[in-house]
Amino acid sequence: MISLKGEGLSLRDILKKIVIPSVCFPWGIAAFLMFILHFGGDFPDIYSYAQPRLGAAFAVMLIVSFGLFSVFSKDYLKRLLPWAVILPLLWAGTFTWAYGFASLPEKKHLGDYYVLGALLFSLPYVYTIGLMKCGGYVRAALQVMYGAFSFFMLLFPLIYISYYWRFGGEMDLFALMAVRATHWEEVKEFLSTMGSPLVLGLAIGVLLLLLLAAYVLTQQVGRCAESGEGLLRGSGKKIKVGLIVISILFFGGFIRQIIHVFPINLYRTMNSKGSEFQLLQNFNTNLDKNTAGLKLIDPADGLDEGTHIVIIGESANRDHLKAFTPSYPEGTTPWLSSKVNDPDFSLNYMAYSNFPNTLMSLSYAMTSANQYGDMDLSHAVSMVDAARAAGYRTDWISFQNRSSLSSAGVTLIAERSDASFWEKNYDEYAVDVMKKLPPAKRRVLFINIMGSHYTYLARVPADQRGALGISENDPYYGYDLTAAYTDRVIRDIFEYAKAHMNLKSLVYFSDHGENMEHFHSTSPFFYDMVHIPFFVYLSPDYQAAHPSLMPVLKSHEKRPFTNDLAFDTVTGLWRAKTNFYHAAYDLSSPDYAITMEDAKTFGGKRMVKDDPALAK
């Protein structure tokens, strides 16, 4: 057989055997996909398909189709078709569902997966030619490589679907950052709760099935190439040149495209220069550099003696805290509820986290960085550095695990303290550590508790659960137990510091909130993931020395506040104002400027005023 007209095919044959099938095949696929996507609701008319990446996908389909029909015989195209179509169908099907039916954002990326699907379809044909030309160890190596390739190409869509099934949203950059930052102890806790023998058995079974599927796919594709006869449309020079061209084109195109889709696109974004992850990795260097330029606005000559405490909660949702939501049926905050009308306490009922992710939220909350455009992480200083510059001794007690991101985030801030204590115990042991602290005339103490960190029941000693007053019929029993336990822990910290440490102020806020179904994530996002508690205690003598603070705090209790402004607020309270301080972001300042029109969350990408809870 001959390849082209110059070698024997008539124009009619070229038109019939190459051109028409090459055009009809991608048009048929495109029509089918448009028909399916129409039912998802996001592609209601023909104009909604006018997206550059969908156009690029169609162009790639045409190129792939023309290349395959030009080089390979009709019989071989049919013979390999059932096996060549498996991976493209899996990828195209998964992401057609994700972007067409699952209401995921960034629908412009759908075309990327159709490009990948077209190139995936071409690879078995290219691979079998290489297999046919090789023997011995080279052939065996090719088969192993194709088997491994098939396994991972089967696995990645399954991971995507599983994550969505478990959390109700796509696995995005911040989910991957959280996974990368997860400590082994957290993995063990998660597996002990979610990983029942049945679930673990199913997971192992699925992996074994995927290995088997990859093996079968590799073997079947290999069998199609066992006979060298009938693979190509001809044996002339043009066919051989065409084969080389499409092999380079399709394989090179696949390599280029795979880096733009899940999960490699997330990994590349996470590690790209200038990304939030890279900023966190450079956090320590930047803090050192920025702290060198730290200057006090007010000299600390008259700095009050005593202790200031900042308690950083975990996954606390104020909607579940009766002190903030009096209509909540469970008595989750008996101690704090008793302080609601206390003249020494101020509760903010409109507090929000800046981000539904610990890594990002605390990196902003504990530094001068904020989401209002004044400062980013690369130019920020930490609360610890501001306190030390003002002449305070700083201590940090943490019940969290040290992050595996050893050069980033809150762990680095903690280790900038004069002393840091990393405890592996229940939050109530904070008082035991406080008793061991060296004496200091002026101290800022940070306590980072586990609070309501999943898994919930693991946060509360079993012998105390019955005494916390939470009904076992409560649908959120485990979570509400952690809230009641945290209330008791804060009470004990407060009472001890007041009696033994000359307590001047205590500030409490959470890193982020929690959704009872989806926990906290960027996808899907719900506003209760950023609903957090925030309160301030000022001792009577501290109020007497600074009489404007509490009245201003009380007047701002119904003003929106986001925890990336905690730096300005606490340094204002401590009289530790620096050149990084902004009165407009200090909740205790009469110049506090954030209104409902200004308040932001989700790294500045969402407005607080759009919170559906505000419309109730």
Where are these regions (language model features)?
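Transmembrane and membrane-interface helices of multi-pass
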Residues: 2-265
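Histidine-centered active-site microenvironments of extracellular/periplasmic hydrolases
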Residues: 88-93, 324-331, 498, 502-503, ...
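Catalytic cores of PAPS-dependent sulfotransferases
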Residues: 136-142, 167, 183-186, 193-195, ...
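Active-site-proximal alpha/beta segments of enzymes that process anionic O-linked groups
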Residues: 242-467, 562-563, 568-593
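A long, amphipathic alpha-helix that forms part
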Residues: 291, 295, 432-435, 467-506, ...
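A short beta-strand-to-alpha-helix junction
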Residues: 374-379, 472-484, 522-530, 543-570, ...
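C-terminal luminal/periplasmic domains and tails of membrane-associated envelope-modifying transferases
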Residues: 389, 439-440, 495, 550-551, ...
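Phosphate/adenylate-binding glycine loop and adjacent helical scaffold
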Residues: 578-616
